[in-house]
Amino acid sequence: MYAIIETGGKQIKVEAGQEIYVEKLAGEVGDVVTFDKVLFVGGDSAKVGVPFVDGATVTAKVEKQGRAKKLTVYKYKPKKNYHKKQGHRQPYTKLTIDAINA
């Protein structure tokens, strides 16, 4: 059985036992997170939500809070002596999917 959930403005296909990386969620390591925005549940009998499947939830456990590798943003304007260098590290949350309840 699998499901498609919405979190952080993105849609992610998940299965039980899978590890996923999502946009930063509030919670400490070991906390349980429940996703109510389930768009689709697949398996023996598929359920399509309009826009969400009624009564369907996905539970996951927070494994890690972290930050991605650094991205360097460099801007400049030619012939004007304007240079700007800036770094960015996107925060993320690593989850392990425990169960899909449909």
UniProtKB/Swiss-Prot annotation:
Pfam families: Ribosomal_L21p (PF00829). GO terms for cellular component: cytoplasm; ribonucleoprotein complex; ribosome. The keyword RNA-binding applies. InterPro entries: bL21-like, bL21-like_sf, Ribosomal_bL21, Ribosomal_bL21_CS. One of its GO terms (biological process) is translation. SUPFAM superfamilies: L21p-like. Keywords: Ribonucleoprotein, Ribosomal protein, RNA-binding, rRNA-binding. GO terms for molecular function: rRNA binding; structural constituent of ribosome. This protein binds to 23S rRNA in the presence of protein L20. Belongs to the bacterial ribosomal protein bL21 family. PANTHER family: 50S RIBOSOMAL PROTEIN L21 (PTHR21349), LARGE RIBOSOMAL SUBUNIT PROTEIN BL21M (PTHR21349:SF0). Part of the 50S ribosomal subunit. Contacts protein L20. This is Large ribosomal subunit protein bL21. The gene is rplU.
